[in-house]
Amino acid sequence: MLEKAPNGKVAALLNALDKALSAGELERAVELFQTDCYWRDLVTFTWNIKTMEGKDQVRDMLQAQLADTKPSNWKIADGEDASEADGITDAWIQFETGVSRGFGHLRMKDGQIWTLLTTMSELKGHEEPIGFDRPMGAKHGADRNRKTWKEEREAEAAELGHSCQPYCVIVGGGQGGIALAARLRQLNVPTIIIEKNERPGDSWRKRYKSLCLHDPVWYDHLPYLPFPRNWPVFSPKDKIGDWLEMYTKVMELNYWTSTVCKKASYDEKSREWTVVVERDGREIVLKPKQLVLATGMSAKANMPKFEGMDMFKGDQHHSSQHPGPDKYKGKKAVVIGSNNSAHDICAALWESGVDVTMVQRSTTHIVKSDSLMEIGLGSLYSEQAVQSGMTTAKADLIFASLPYKIMHEFQIPVYNAIRERDADFYKRLEKAGFLLDYGEDGSGLFMKYLRRGSGYYIDVGASELIADGSIKLKSGVDVKKLTEHSVILSDGTELLADLVVYATGYGSMNGWAADLISKHVADKVGKVWGLGSNTTKDPGPWEGEQRNMWKPTQQEALWFHGGNLHQSRHYSQFLSLQLKARMEGIPTPVYGLQKVHHLG
């Protein structure tokens, strides 16, 4: 009986919650929550991605949404058991609303709800055709008018965007756009991806020669089609490019290559976009109801402007345009920046016999890849996690169940352990002059990524080259100007250079809205990315969720989708369900639409 005690606790709590919500007794429901509670909802109650922090916010949300949501049938998820450790009871849960089925995660403390995650799994009557409902494929029987699968796909490709319009247009065909389009395909939402490159996967292939994913394979699966079990831990850029190209074909995506989105505008009366694209040398006008910008966090380059750039006689380019090291053997290179791209490019240049200097203008968080995998990701995304029964879906939901408000409290001990383990490594870097940080509150890489999307390097070898002096370093300085053959730094140092690489990062995705739609719409939407943590590059006030990502924005029918492969996989589910509901005319009363505090 003892092993069933956690189940009994959770079942009793869920039963009480079910009864209170069904009866519309808000106070009774709210009393089931801890004072310092967190309820993170992915679409089910709020038609938004929203975290309620504390009882008052839970009460306010329920008061606004309960009548429309009609939640019921709360219980421990089928086939699951609750567990208990250190005074916290954990459980996977399931429930329904009037229009959907939900899945979630619960943490109980002292008999009350401490953290609650609710996510929309599917819309009733609009389930994905999987399992027993998978399509037959072959059509048995005799039919003189039979069309093959290939003929049907060719007909669809010829008609969509011409004789019939897509419901959704996705601008950007990297992993974000591809993952979302795959979800929408399964939900029967007519969708076209607009991609400027010649082939799917080119956004990876065309990056610098040495690029590999820094996240391990277990973290990077796409929806429906995980990587094979023999896939390398870290994917080389061309290999991941080929995988994305294959994925677009087998998932039957309508992917328009060599197509440039010229402009877009929204008609408030018809509630329809006009999207002008150029394809095969001719202009095509698309009329979707929904527009998704999946142009990527690493798509709009931040190109600095330094005095003398027009005088420099050597090669200079942003890291996104770096062709690789081959043509620079025996020459001198200066790389401005100290994050992932800067380190990768410096290491590749050194390997090719280039005299390379990194210019580090501000502190950078460094974490060794093996330490990150073992201590930071190992419990959720590793071969050990897989062998213990952890699935990608569960790992994603466990990560999602930690409210951003307190996530740093879970991350600080992780990075303290990494600092202790790799103390000698960090000492050698500091001795070489490298300026280190561990996040402004010591919470490390993940929080830095969520807050600002930059400021770190996952070390796969370049840090050792800096520590031993193979890669030269100038830190704590900025660029003053360029001359014909050199870079002059703010401390007066002159660095001779045949090549200057600006590894200076990328701008907000909001910039694409300004370019494609208008500055007015970009300002109306506001800054994209960040939590409002009031840390560097993430100004307050506190938002509690990523600004404008995967959820409704202040511009009707305009959405932003992107992030790393993990986020592209996980959040594509919830964005696709929001779009499907709107296509089907299902009411989607949005609660807590994000206010705009900062422009892009």
What are these regions (language model features)?
Residues 140-166, 317-330:
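A short, basic/flexible loop-to-alpha-helix module at the beginning of a structural domain
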Residues 176, 198-199, 341, 364:
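Conserved Rossmann-like nucleotide-cofactor binding loop
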Residues 19, 23-85:
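A solvent-exposed, acidic/Ser-Thr-rich amphipathic alpha-helical stretch
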Residues 1-35, 153-165:
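Short, low-complexity N-terminal intrinsically disordered segments enriched in polar/charged residues
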Residues 158-193, 340-350:
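N-terminal Rossmann-like FAD-binding beta1-loop-alpha1 element of flavoenzymes
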